[in-house]
Swiss-Prot record:
Function: Specifically methylates the guanine in position 1835 (m2G1835) of 23S rRNA.
Enzyme Commission number: 2.1.1.174
Keyword S-adenosyl-L-methionine: yes
Protein name: Ribosomal RNA large subunit methyltransferase G
Catalytic reaction equation(s): guanosine(1835) in 23S rRNA + S-adenosyl-L-methionine = N(2)-methylguanosine(1835) in 23S rRNA + S-adenosyl-L-homocysteine + H(+)
Keyword NAD tagged: no
GO cellular component terms listed in the entry, alphabetical order: cytoplasm
PANTHER family to which the protein is assigned, alphabetical: RIBOSOMAL RNA LARGE SUBUNIT METHYLTRANSFERASE G (PTHR47816:SF5), RIBOSOMAL RNA SMALL SUBUNIT METHYLTRANSFERASE C (PTHR47816)
Main location: cytoplasm
Record localization: Cytoplasm
HAMAP family reported for this sequence: 23SrRNA_methyltr_G
UniProt GO MF annotations: 23S rRNA (guanine(1835)-N(2))-methyltransferase activity; nucleic acid binding
EC main group: transferase
Amino acid sequence: MPLLTTPYAELDLIRQPEQANDPLQAFDAADEYLLAQLHDQAPDANCRVLVLNDSFGALAASLAGQLQVVSSGDSHLGHLALEKNLARNGLPFDSVPFVPASEHWQGPFDRVLVRVPKTLALLEEQLIRLQGQLAPGAQVIAGAMIKHLPRAAGDLMEKYIGPVQASLALKKARLLTATVAERPLAKSPYPSCYRLDAPALDLVNHANVFCREGLDIGTRAFLPHLPRNLGRARVADLGCGNGVLAIASALANPEAEYTLVDESYMAVQSAQENWLAALGERPATFLAADGLAGLEKQSLDVVLCNPPFHQQQVVGDFLAWRMFQQAREALVVGGALYIVGNRHLGYHSKLARLFRGVEQVAATPKFVILKARK
């Protein structure tokens, strides 16, 4: 893989999760453009820089030890990538503090480097949080590949920060620079909430939660077919989102024990709040994690999963395949993985390569619900 070479550093970077022979690199031209732009401004060593949504640590690791850097984002895998890439390049583990998106950072900051996220609600929430956290004369510089840069990103920066200047395109990347100006303090519209009829739940969704404004159709197809009569089973909701699968299952299985896992900090925050609202003080475990990688082998009886088919803007089934592998490792012999998936993704054949028995529980014109037994 090529090295990231910028005015600040030459770094050997890897993506997360790691894949053998991964053809994708851990940085792009937007990262290079952001770092070059910052360097051209010649900030001194005391400059406080906040890095937002740094996919695999390219920005923060480049600035580590040179400026006063704080990184924040909603991806646990992004956090893990930053830690691994710091170590991989001989940089101190604690040279870049990381603040999960479920928590608030402490300014003032002189510069903010932003990778424009896929979910504009997350960008809006972050820009609102920046109000009152920026030093006089501060700039917010957002970068993206042009094909992933919506016009609305600049509109949001103008609304919450100040006047925006768009750069020329460079290697198919573009920057938007907002200079701090007087703006009325905004009240965040997040989290949002929607009502589910069966089971009757009011579900809280923080800004970066998948299908924040309503139940996704895959989960809607899955809910009527969740397993019952689980007794004291140990159940994991893998990729839990707002926690609706685990909560619905827990309501039908009062003795079962639940672990809710997602790589999004805001998803886990939403799941925890929704569990508390629906089930009170009933114990459960909530993890922002790399799937089930940290769980002991053969520690679960049931895994529920509505697997994603994209990581940021990259589409594919590699995350789902990895989740299936993790579920197999974590399940006891005889344990079962229940999933929902689009028919065209062919999950049945993939599961058959890992599990001794795969059966179709139900189907709609678009989705299948499958049970795979170890």
